[in-house]
Regions:
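Juxtamembrane/disordered regions of integral membrane proteins
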Residues: 1-186
Length: 186
């Protein structure tokens, strides 16, 4: 068994590597994720309608109904006419990129801690690189790539965008696995 204390360096470095890789994918390679989102052609009108409804931060569904209303002809009409979707609203104000980046780095650390915890229980010191790589890579891939797939299934995120997120997750998993394999205790 390998302890978390023995894996502090791969935990930290893999988090840093993933953080920088994600920065490249999202901020430098503008062709990769920039086309994933688009605005409304009548953004001012949509924004005014949302403000008029006094909607605070949260998740909103359109059309919204309770389960017992699903069979109601008026509700079914709303679904047929559209739009049908989910809208996420944040608090009004300037985007705080620093807070988002801090939360993302904390998530990267958390993933690496769980990868270390799992691999530390199933692998011994001196385990060959490829065995560490496979174990940690599988765990990291499940964390970074698979957790977001239900967004496309249930919330309508475009599959093209979702596949890109899975590819991102694969890159992050490979970086995490490589770091752990490289720095695995003898």
């Amino acid at each position: 068994m390998v302890t978390l204390a023995q894996l502090w360096l791969p935990i930290l470095l893999s988090s840093v590597f993933v953080f920088f890789a994600s920065s490249i994918l999202h901020m430098v390679l503008k062709f990769w994720h920039m086309p994933d989102g688009s605005g409304f052609s009548n953004e001012d009108e949509v924004g005014a309608a949302i403000r008029k409804g006094s909607s605070g931060a949260g998740m909103y569904m359109i059309p919204y109904c309770k389960p017992e209303q699903m069979k109601d002809p008026a509700t079914q009409d709303k679904f047929r006419q559209g739009p049908v979707g989910v809208i996420f609203l944040r608090q009004p104000g300037a985007m705080n990129l620093g807070a988002f980046l801090g939360q993302w780095f904390a998530f990267c650390l958390l993933v690496s801690v769980f990868c270390a915890h799992l691999s530390g229980h199933v692998l011994a010191g001196g385990t060959p690189y490829m065995r560490v790589f496979g174990t940690v890579g599988t765990a990291a891939f499940m964390c970074y790539a698979l957790g977001s797939v239900p967004n496309a299934i249930w919330w309508g995120h475009p599959w093209k965008s979702q596949i890109k997120h899975v590819i991102d997750g694969l890159i992050y998993a490979l970086l995490t696995a490589g770091t752990f394999g490289w720095l695995w205790p003898a």
